[in-house]
């Protein structure tokens, strides 16, 4: 977990957001670094690995000039809800937003908030039955997060490959 946790902390601190330290304490105390994902990456540390995979994919595929700090925030916090064994998919995004903003006091801009809130929706252009989701109104950040999340869920990386990439990224910056 060492380099993975260091990478997440470094990336979030680089955003220089108010309450980032409170967010990092929440993530540590509530088990973000050891949490499992619900339907993929179902092993200890799965949420951490998945979130890093999502971030790496999103950074590589950012063709719309989305600010890097927004990509970091959305990707690393989109599954914050997995802490303490939470598994209710229907409230997945809203719980992640609530933990970051209300519990930790961390500020999300509008695009980040919407991307995290709706990241589980929009696998088709219709959204989910009975929701007020409309894919055409969402930002490029939401589209990037959705695509990166879907890619990681379907194509998990080997931990050693991630560790090598993180070492390279940490050395560069």
Descriptions of predicted regions:
Residues 1-173:
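Metal-dependent phosphohydrolase cores
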